[in-house]
A protein has these predicted regions:
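A glycine-rich beta-to-alpha transition motif near the start of alpha/beta enzyme domains, typified by
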Residues: 1-110, 145-269
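Active-site glycine-rich loop that binds ribose-phosphate moieties when present
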Residues: 118-134, 159-161
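Internal active-site segments that recognize and position negatively charged phosphoryl groups
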Residues: 128-155
């Protein structure tokens, strides 16, 4: 079984084509693929499939390393989009892909960069959690965005301690992603991301979008540069909360699963 591993700002995914899979991707199999020592090792798996729908090049499913399926990944979407171009699924600069969160409309800017029309975010209100004021938004997946006062305060946070109780709070029945952010300038913010089913990550495209929307709702500029541990993303938030995400992604390597690993995966339910 052939696969490619891609990364975007340190957020790495295994990309597989459904037609090449000898079995269905189940939570156990996803966990085995993402295992760092006995599998490929990744932050998740992206499954691409052909669709018979005018204007659509593919459908995309996103799996977290714990085996759960996510509605969307901003970094994963860019990786999948650029993979589709490189693999010859399309030669168009603009096309659509289907996700659990709805239609994504990318524009290819270069071999390694694209802009993705992520659709409209939803303002889902504010509250207080773990001693922090938060803004809840949905950008295709749930995002709990928390503003802190300074870079020093942001750096001092232990996301390993704060992330799990926020992610699993009863107010978020499907669990939530969490972004902590601070304003560096009206058009520049710094963020740290705790992803649902993953933990703290070097970057997250949808996490960056969640922080950017929260920043915009507080009167911040758009577009805004979101500075993450893994690099920078540009997010444009319209007055109607319509989001465009721009950033890069690149292939790391391609390979074939060994017969031994394939046999082990096939034995899992």
């Amino acid at each position: 079984m052939r696969f490619e591993k891609w990364q975007a700002l340190g957020n790495d995914y295994v990309i597989v084509e459904r037609d090449a899979l000898p079995f269905e991707l189940t939570p156990e199999r996803v966990r085995a693929l993402c295992a760092p020592h006995s599998g490929i090792g990744a932050d998740g798996v992206l499954e691409l499939a052909h669709v018979d729908e005018p204007g659509f090049v593919a459908s995309l499913r996103v799996f977290n390393p714990d085996g759960s399926e996510a509605e969307l990944s901003g970094n994963g979407a860019r990786e999948a989009i650029l993979y589709l171009r490189r693999a010859g699924w399309t030669d168009q600069e603009q096309f659509s892909i289907r996700t659990a969160a709805g239609e994504l409309r990318p524009t290819i800017l270069s071999d390694t960069t694209c802009r993705v029309d992520m659709g409209r975010a939803r303002d889902e209100g504010t509250g207080e959690i773990c001693g922090f004021a938060y803004q809840q938004v949905n950008v295709g997946n749930p995002q709990c965005s928390i503003r802190v006062t300074s870079e020093a305060d942001l750096a001092a946070l232990s996301l390993a301690e704060l992330g799990p109780p926020i992610e699993t709070d009863v107010r978020f029945p499907n669990r939530t992603n969490v972004s902590f952010w601070t304003e560096l300038a009206p058009n520049r913010i710094r963020a740290r991301i705790f992803e649902r089913g993953v933990g703290e990550t070097a970057s997250s495209g949808t996490g960056a979008c969640g922080a950017a929307v929260a920043h915009a709702l507080r009167g911040g500029d758009s577009p805004v540069t979101v500075v993450l541990d893994g690099g920078e993303l540009e997010v444009e938030v319209g007055d109607d909360l319509h989001i465009d995400l721009t950033g890069w992604a690149e292939p790391v390597y391609a390979g074939e699963l060994s017969p031994e690993l394939l046999s082990r995966l096939a034995s899992l339910s």
